[in-house]
Amino acid sequence: MSAADALLQDLLSGDATRIHASACRVAVTFDPGLLDALAPHADRIERACAGVTLGGALLANQVHLQSALKRLRYWQAQAGCLCALTPTYLFFDPRRLIEQGQMQLLSVGDADDGWGECHHVACTQCGQHWQVTDREYHYPWWEWKVA
């Protein structure tokens, strides 16, 4: 079974744990093969997940599913570079994206407000420059702004 098939089965399963784990993976993927395979199923996934309580404490886990669906629809519509979605999902760690080759590190410094580290990065696909600030409030998250 392919990775895309396994993710699709999880997302259609009705099992909150499987949906959550797979939605988190889809929400951050840049893999064209996964996106090509899953994007046509976005509406089906949304229908299958309707009414499934995904839980969450400070942040509803539904945010991961919504971000995954948004990513699939954006890809399907060929709306542009996937980096445009980074500000809409708090869990894009610029260090991971640099490791994956999706972003290039331009510089690192302190955040303008003194809270957190600021990474200046550029998308390796489209060249868009981003200012990404490490944030934390019960869990780490990242604030992405066009530079």
Which residue stretches match the model-derived regions?
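Amphipathic alpha-helical scaffolding segments comprising HEAT/armadillo-like alpha-solenoid repeats
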Residues: 1-10, 29-51
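Generic helix N-cap/helix-start motif at coil->alpha-helix transitions
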Residues: 1-2, 15-21
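Short, intrinsically disordered terminal segments enriched in charged and Pro/Gly residues
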Residues: 9, 24, 138-147
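Short inter-helical turns and helix N-cap capping residues of alpha-solenoid HEAT/ARM repeat scaffolds
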Residues: 14-16, 46-50, 58
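Alpha-helix initiation and capping sites
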Residues: 15-16, 30-35, 74-77
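Structural detector for internal amphipathic alpha-helices that build alpha-solenoid repeat scaffolds
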Residues: 20-31, 52-71
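Short recognition patches in nucleic-acid-associated and regulatory proteins
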Residues: 79-118, 132-135, 141-142
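Short Cys/His-rich metal-coordination motifs, predominantly Zn2+-binding knuckles/fingers
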Residues: 84-86, 123-126
